[in-house]
Amino acid sequence: MQNILTPKHSTYTVSLCFDGGAAQRLVDAQKRLAQICRNNFLIEHSVPPHVTLGAFHAEPGALPKLQKTFDGFAKEAREVLGGNGLDLEFGGTDSFLDKVVFLAAKKDSPSFVSLKTLNEILHQKFLPLFEAGSNKNYLPERWLPHAALAVKLRPDQFKKCAAFLGHASDFVLPQSARVAALSLALCKPYTELCRAAF
């Protein structure tokens, strides 16, 4: 008999990671919003700024296969990007369901096309082996590339964030950020398992 408190699988993400300068600018923005809306989930859980390409469920014993698949994807991603990483252009702030505030990738930019290509390749490699996670929101047909600024917001916190972002002239968000690596991470608790630099 299986213990009902023991999950059958864990959720893992494959994400794009920013270089040190870009990551710090995004952390500074996350901290400022955390002060405004009184929600510091991202800071408290030490989740570095990133763009999630995909989320997948895997059984506990599947970690070696997951890491091998990640390594194969990282090699292909380097080829797609010419081994140079990616300068990601942002198009401004947006939100999901009044619970997440994020910086969206600029839709009419070359970097957006590269992101969509990476997302499609990732799912071609991972879906035959692993189940899509996070309510399938990262599947190519549903995915909107973004870097989260605040998550798990209550309605009152979301209103504070939205009001602040709509009127804060001194709050400057980055227009672009350098993507320097890929990471494979366990979601709960957030734990980076491996990283592949471009």
Regions found by a protein language model. Give the residues of each.
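Glycine-rich beta-strand-turn "strand-cap" elements at beta-sheet edges
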Residues: 89-98, 177-194
